[in-house]
């Protein structure tokens, strides 16, 4: 298993443990839209989009553009590297424990 796949599994396991809904977007196919983040999540009513990258990975311009558009629309757009996993976990926990109005 590649380091990127192990990291993806770690993130998905954490989201499951937190009771979050998410879907893995399989891009790159003939009938799929390019630039969509890897994980589309709902965390306590908040839209969270996560683009996963390995330690040395780089986001493409279209991925960054999409994340920016999600951010502008009021969602949480995250470009996630392994060294930022703890910060990601804190954000998800904070969103998950936020009181709904």
Regions found by a protein language model. Give the residues of each.
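Catalytic phosphate/metal-binding cores of nucleic-acid and nucleotide-processing enzymes, i.e., regions
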Residues: 1-101
